[in-house]
């Protein structure tokens, strides 16, 4: 919120919290981009990028930070982009690249296909193979 004020973007951005799942799905499904530039903050970081997989399941490609689980859920330059979440120029450049030449359309198609690797039935099947 503080950064949005510093950049005079308060009218361009909406910050939501505690939203229900129907609204979350509607917002994701109508997006062109899922952006979460994760970064390590006081040794705390997202372990796996389930949010990226969720967006991908709707055909929405992502830009994620190089720290944390984004690299497990995003194939750089195929299902989205990985950037330096601590560097505003890196984030900016990634957003510009994302929309250049309609890259986001192709990224979204690949992201949707890639998200199928994370369906629970497939994960359970693979775990059963490991223990048998």
Language-model region placement:
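Conserved acidic donor-binding segment of nucleotide-sugar-dependent glycosyltransferases
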Residues: 76-77, 81-88, 96-102
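Short hydrophobic beta-strand element within catalytic cores of glycosyltransferases
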Residues: 52, 57, 61-64, 74
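Short alpha-helical donor nucleotide-sugar binding micro-motif in glycosyltransferases
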Residues: 18-19, 26-31, 127
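C-terminal alpha-helical cap of glycosyltransferases
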Residues: 1, 120-132
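A short, well-ordered alpha-helix in the C-terminal region of glycosyltransferases
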Residues: 90, 97, 103-117, 126-129
């Amino acid at each position: 919120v503080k950064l949005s004020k510093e950049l005079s973007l308060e009218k361009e951005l909406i910050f939501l919290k505690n939203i229900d799942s129907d609204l979350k799905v509607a917002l994701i499904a109508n997006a062109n981009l899922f952006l979460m530039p994760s970064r390590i903050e006081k040794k705390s970081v997202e372990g796996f990028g389930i949010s990226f997989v969720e967006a991908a399941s709707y055909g929405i490609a992502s830009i994620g930070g190089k720290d944390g689980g984004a690299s497990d859920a995003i194939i750089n330059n195929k299902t989205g982009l990985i950037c330096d979440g601590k560097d505003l120029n890196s984030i900016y450049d990634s957003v510009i690249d994302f929309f250049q030449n309609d890259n986001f359309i192709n990224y979204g198609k690949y992201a949707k296909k890639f998200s199928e690797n994370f369906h629970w039935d497939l994960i359970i099947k693979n775990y059963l193979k490991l223990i048998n």
